[in-house]
């Protein structure tokens, strides 16, 4: 009798895990400039969260250098595994499956994590679970709020993505709205550069804005054809042009007020559209995810206005908004429970679309 292939053996293991309804997931995230390994139980319980950040290195270049990012992922990933196992007080024998981000992101960075995860899964005879990075961000809410269950509406806002999504069930999504051009995080980074704020611009702009008057400068509100869509390109351009015009006139720009006024414009647009989508879909619960979800004004406005609209509002702690592997472990568990596994030919997909699997 011909022996079963790796894929066939893993399907049998995954079936047993699904019947049991429990799984300890080793998760890997390497889509950009953070290498991360986490251990998550049942999609809800964080056992370990090991992260190696590259921010200080890329800050020297004013942004992420893909080749450097890939090399640093290779150097960091094995030590992070040891750290994660130590944090969880467990061994590889206790791991039931491996989840890995396979897109979207930087191709070289993704390949590091995918190749490592495939090798580990094959060597340890463990099921391999492919996870969309953006779905991971949404799933961070499951770890932060063990009582949160679908359906709910989620605003996903990061450096490369801005979406409003209806989460109808675990792993089942409907795209309600999205940016028609730039992502919110990209707009924050570009305006930060104009204000001579060093990398990473978005978080530093947020801190600067806390000290400013958000009514000091007037910026246009972008219009979109889609009822729930965003547009940040025009706003970003208007803000940058206004800064250049003021400087050409010899006028001083108050960086704190400028940052605060810009932040207010972006946050108002994000919150307005998200609450409109929640109202029109009849949602009772609202969540937020992604790096921009760490923005202090966005968090406070979503909570204040969401609760005023009668919604239950959930958001991850800031440490789970930026890239991490805990969120990948959470998403991976529900993919496993749905019977979704990767074959060993799994490849990195840097342009993977929203929740495309």
Sequence positions of predicted segments:
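Conserved phosphate-binding/catalytic loops in two-lobed NTP-binding clefts
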Residues: 130-131, 303-328
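Active-site neighborhood for divalent-cation/phosphate handling
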Residues: 103, 107-109, 117, 123-146
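Glycine-rich phosphate-binding/hydrolytic loop that grips phosphoryl groups
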Residues: 316-354
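Conserved phosphate-binding catalytic cores of ATP/NTP-utilizing and phosphoryl-transfer enzymes
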Residues: 6-23, 131-153, 331
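Short beta-strand scaffold segments in enzyme catalytic cores
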Residues: 35-41, 154-156, 162-166
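A contiguous, well-structured pocket-lining segment that forms one wall/lid of small-molecule binding clefts
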Residues: 49, 207-286, 295-309, 336, ...
């Amino acid at each position: 009798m011909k022996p079963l292939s790796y894929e066939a053996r893993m399907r049998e293991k995954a079936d047993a895990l699904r019947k049991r309804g429990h799984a300890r997931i080793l998760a890997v995230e390497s889509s950009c400039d953070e290498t991360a390994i986490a251990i998550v139980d049942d999609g809800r319980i964080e056992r370990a969260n090991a992260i190696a950040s590259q921010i200080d290195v890329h800050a020297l270049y004013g942004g992420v250098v893909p080749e450097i990012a890939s090399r640093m992922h290779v150097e960091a990933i094995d030590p992070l595994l040891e750290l994660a196992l130590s944090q969880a007080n467990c061994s590889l024998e206790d791991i039931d499956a491996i989840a890995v981000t396979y897109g979207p992101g930087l191709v070289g960075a993704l390949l590091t994590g995918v190749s490592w995860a495939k090798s580990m899964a094959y060597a340890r005879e463990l099921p391999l679970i492919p996870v969309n990075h953006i779905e991971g961000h949404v799933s961070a809410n499951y770890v932060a709020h063990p009582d949160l269950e679908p359906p709910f509406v989620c605003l996903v806002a990061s450096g490369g993505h801005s979406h409003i999504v209806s989460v109808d069930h675990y792993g089942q999504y409907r795209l309600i709205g999205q940016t028609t051009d730039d992502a919110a995080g990209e707009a924050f980074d570009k305006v930060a550069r104009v204000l001579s704020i060093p990398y990473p611009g978005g978080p530093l702009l947020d801190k600067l804005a806390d000290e400013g008057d958000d009514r000091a400068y007037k910026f246009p509100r972008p219009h979109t054809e889609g009822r729930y869509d965003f547009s940040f390109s025009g706003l970003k351009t208007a803000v940058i042009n206004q800064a250049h015009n003021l400087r050409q006139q010899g006028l001083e720009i108050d960086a704190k007020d400028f940052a605060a006024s810009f932040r207010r414009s972006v946050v108002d647009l994000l919150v307005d559209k998200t609450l409109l989508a929640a109202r029109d879909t009849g949602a009772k619960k609202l969540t937020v995810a992604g790096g921009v979800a760490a923005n202090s004004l966005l968090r406070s406005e979503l909570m204040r206005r969401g609760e005023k609209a009668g919604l239950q509002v959930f958001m991850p702690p800031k440490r789970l908004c930026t890239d991490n592997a805990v969120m990948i472990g959470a998403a991976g568990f529900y993919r496993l429970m749905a019977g979704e596994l990767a074959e060993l030919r799994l490849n990195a997909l840097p342009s993977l679309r929203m929740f495309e699997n």
